[in-house]
């Protein structure tokens, strides 16, 4: 069972460039938000005639909350390609298609099947993230054949690093397989799926802040019945409901990186997921 919510927390969402000013003949890529920015940064590493820009700030909690502006349209108008997560996460997609029907849009999740709750935050499952990388790479190679070999080499390098990360924690993750946890953030169920954990469903209108008293009561009863001792939340999120449930059940609260925001660093995803694997390996 997976926890599903509608929407995410909101912060500033002004456009930001992750590279130097574009030259007129550069291949221009615009990404929708932070996870796609980091992914594409790795694929375009050391390719001098490619200009990469993120449409949103790296502190935007969810692209659902991005207010699409005329500046965004101008940015996309001048782009050769727009890279998005897909799975209906970028709700403004129809505006892009309507304004620029010939814009090349790469939906990173094209080869990813959303889980049973249609959770689009698939990048916290490394297996699905690798599928995103491979698809974006293949499309960039097709659309920008001049740099085909470089995209391919960067894809291979990045996937090898991710596979190494998987290998480093394979034994630790196998020890927790099948354990049941309570998840209080919509970005974390795909991580649980990757770790082969069972998860408790709890209904909420927005993140974990509007959970009803009845929902909390029922969750506490289920956790006690199944002896669930782990609660997963996102780093920086409101701990109020998690602490209420933890007090009643004796469960421990674990904070994870959503990989939704962070430093604009080529190794950001690798570093965040390594931290997540260390934490998840310690659950009770």
PLM region spans:
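Sec-dependent N-terminal signal peptides
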Residues: 1-2
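Extracytoplasmic metal-acquisition and chelation regions
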Residues: 8-284
């Amino acid at each position: 069972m997976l926890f599903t919510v509608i929407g995410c927390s909101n912060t500033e969402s002004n456009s930001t460039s992750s590279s130097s000013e574009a030259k007129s003949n550069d291949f221009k890529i615009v990404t929708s938000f932070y996870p796609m920015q980091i992914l594409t940064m790795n694929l375009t590493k050391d390719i001098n005639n490619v200009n990469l820009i993120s449409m949103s700030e790296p502190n935007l909690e969810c692209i659902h909350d991005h207010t699409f502006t005329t500046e965004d349209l101008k940015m996309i108008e001048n782009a050769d390609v727009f890279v998005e997560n897909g799975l209906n996460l970028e709700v403004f997609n129809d505006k892009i298609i309507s304004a620029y029907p010939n814009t090349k849009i790469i939906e990173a999740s094209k080869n990813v099947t959303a889980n049973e709750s249609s959770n689009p935050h698939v990048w916290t499952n490394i297996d699905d993230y690798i599928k995103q990388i491979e698809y974006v790479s293949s499309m960039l190679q097709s659309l920008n054949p001049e740099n085909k070999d470089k995209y391919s080499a960067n894809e291979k390098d990045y996937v090898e690093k991710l596979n190494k990360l998987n290998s480093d924690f394979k034994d630790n993750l196998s020890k927790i397989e099948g354990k049941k946890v309570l998840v209080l953030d919509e970005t974390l169920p795909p991580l649980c799926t990757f770790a082969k954990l069972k998860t408790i469903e709890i209904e909420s209108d927005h993140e974990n802040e509007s959970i009803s008293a009845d929902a909390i009561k029922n969750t506490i009863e289920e956790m006690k019945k199944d002896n669930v001792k782990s609660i997963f939340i996102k780093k920086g999120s409101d701990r109020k409901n998690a602490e209420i449930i933890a007090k009643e059940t004796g469960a421990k609260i674990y904070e994870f990186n959503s990989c939704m925001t962070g430093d604009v660093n080529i190794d950001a995803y690798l570093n965040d997921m390594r931290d997540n694997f260390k934490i998840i390996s310690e659950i009770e």
